[in-house]
Amino acid sequence: MLYSPRLTDQILIVAGEASADLHAARTLHELQRLRPGITAFGVGGPRLREAGLEALAPAEDISVMGLAEVLPRIPRILGILRMLGRAAAERRPRAALLVDLPDFNLRLAARLKKLGIPVVYYVSPTIWAWRQGRAKKIARVVDRMLCILPFEERFYEGTGVSARFVGHPFAERPPPGPAEAYRSALGLPASRTTIAMVPGSRPSELKRLLPPMLQAAERLRAAHPDAQFVVPVAPTLDRAALEPYLAAHRTLEVRLVDGRTEEVVGASDAALVKSGTSTLEAGLMLRPMVVVYKLSWLSYAVARMLVKIAHVALVNILAGRGIVPELLQGDASPERMAAEVERLLGDRAAREAQIAALREVRASLGEPGAPLRVAEEVLGVMR
């Protein structure tokens, strides 16, 4: 079936991992409110599908991080890229909203540019950290670059990229309440020491991070017999994906919660959090945390050569200094994780200093209303 841009308000949306799926879904809701009858097709996760996206492929098929992880998936990823190009050529959407996922989305943007389809790119690639030469390609294939970090718009000055800081989607969130309120909402005992563990939204992250997190939890339980551990299950994962890891720790009390990462962190006295968007999501809850991450040896070796920033945790990057501990690769051991969490549980001055710095980060994210501003940008470029 052929779709005429004169007869339908249809847009293409592509979002990969869980955070992008959430940001895109909120934007689609705003588009539907501003332009009743608008429809969307593309690639997204459960939240985008709930918002009405016609999903042509599942988000997890293109949401892969790390060179070693990407290589075996290349045929499938390229197949989806070609499929979306064909769908765009047939349906002729009036605009495309591409969210994060730069290695995939910039290639798709180039195809869309040849078709004359305007491209709005939401969540800038981290060109300020590595591969800065991508700015030239962005200038060629992206009509509007919408930045969610306050320093990114300035970075694009002089590159030919039409960029705008729209505020961070997390700025929508109200200030956090007391931990006891979140524990009550999650059905957790209010008086027990509570430790959140946020291992990520990808199977590869679970494989590398959840086992040492659980081993660290065993060590922490020895020091805190009343401790309870809570793990949010990302919307892109099924609980069954976690079961093999939990089976090795049957005596450890671990509560799984579907989604609700901010509530899980809000319920905690301290948290172990995977590096990435999760660190900002957790940081906005103003709870002490330790950031951890592991890549394959090949991916890590490549990253060390290319990355040009001092910190990897988003809250540290925004603060301009190391306000939360970062445990990477070999340092992300059960012993180090447990020791850093123990320090945050026992050292009141360290806790208060980290929380004060996280308040500053929260204040830097701009005013609420990012989904509305993104929707207005999409409508502004529609042919």
Swiss-Prot record:
Role, per record: Condensation of UDP-2,3-diacylglucosamine and 2,3-diacylglucosamine-1-phosphate to form lipid A disaccharide, a precursor of lipid A, a phosphorylated glycolipid that anchors the lipopolysaccharide to the outer membrane of the cell.
Gene: lpxB
Recorded superkingdom: Bacteria
Family: Belongs to the LpxB family.
Name of the protein in question: Lipid-A-disaccharide synthase
A GO MF label: phospholipid binding
Class of this enzyme: transferase
Pathway: Bacterial outer membrane biogenesis; LPS lipid A biosynthesis
Catalytic activities: a lipid X + a UDP-2-N,3-O-bis[(3R)-3-hydroxyacyl]-alpha-D-glucosamine = a lipid A disaccharide + UDP + H(+)
